[in-house]
Amino acid sequence: MFQYIKDQWANGRAIYGKKSWRETRRVILHFLRTVGHKQEMMEYKAFFESYAPDQHILDKQEGLYELMSRIFLFKDSTLRERIDAVKNHFTALEDVFTPETIEMLYNPDELKPEGLKQGILLWEDADLNMTAHLNFMTGQRKEGLFTILLQLGDQGVYHANIRLGKGLEGEPALWIGTIQGYKDGLDNAKHITKKMFGYRPKNFIVFLIRELAKYCKVQSMYAVSDEGFYANTHMVRGHKAKVAELDPLWEDIGGTVTQDPRFFKIPLEEYRKPIEEIKSQKRSQYRKRYELLNKYEEQIRDNVKKYLK
């Protein structure tokens, strides 16, 4: 038991450091929240120690321990739900990606091979000077266990935090924790929308998620609602304003609220309006957009296939 207690304190130090009182306070809170859950913490650790693609993920990404002491992923998530979410995600990965790919994605950047520092290149367009990468970004673990980062040059435009796992009916599913934009995003979004024939970058990152979902063997897709956003758990502390406003996007892409208002169910395929139903003055724009997206679908398929089982 003494060794377990020491381990929980060490985990907190590894996550938060010890340079300031604020960091020490977080270490204390992590310790107090985990020390009484020995069975669950040992289960969590044992899962990763026997994880075939890489038994050292927790050693290299200590931040994953924070999911055991903080109400992350979605509002009012329980410790049991978070343990299951993490285990289900990593179990699903084994059915999709090669062991070498999983190990690479969860390696710290300094251990990634040259050319893969940002993870898997999902998509790029040299004419637009844009790229999209799939990676594990430790700072985004509050909302997901994967991040798709959409960039214009070296500037972030949007990122989506996602995870694999089980849906509300126990089916293989992909979960979107959030989609967030970056500073100067509005100006960039206008530029990108024009170049993509009226297709907004916020919708494009959903397109990228859906394309990835094709290769992840999922049967459904869900998104966390504004009501379910993890940070809204803490609104009772005085933060009265909602910190996420994504419901309009989920509705725009065909999502519907589930019986649990914390989640939307999202169609796996994007609806494309038939050309004949589009006003004549906009048909050329839509036709070019659809042709562009079809080309991107082929590129994404070619980019990811070498990482798949």
Regions found by a protein language model. Give the residues of each.
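Noncatalytic linker/hinge segments flanking ATPase motor cores
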Residues: I71-F74, N203, K214-S220, R262-L268, ...
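Non-catalytic substrate-recognition and accessory regions of acyl/acetyltransferase enzymes
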Residues: M1-H191, K288-K309
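Charge-rich, low-complexity intrinsically disordered segments
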Residues: G255-K309
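Acyl-donor binding region in acyl/amide transferases
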Residues: Y158, G167-V257
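Charge-rich, low-complexity amphipathic helices
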Residues: P108, K112-G115, G119, H234-V236, ...
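Generic, low-specificity signal for short hydrophobic/alpha-helical stretches with a mild N-terminal bias
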Residues: R26, K75, M130, H191, ...
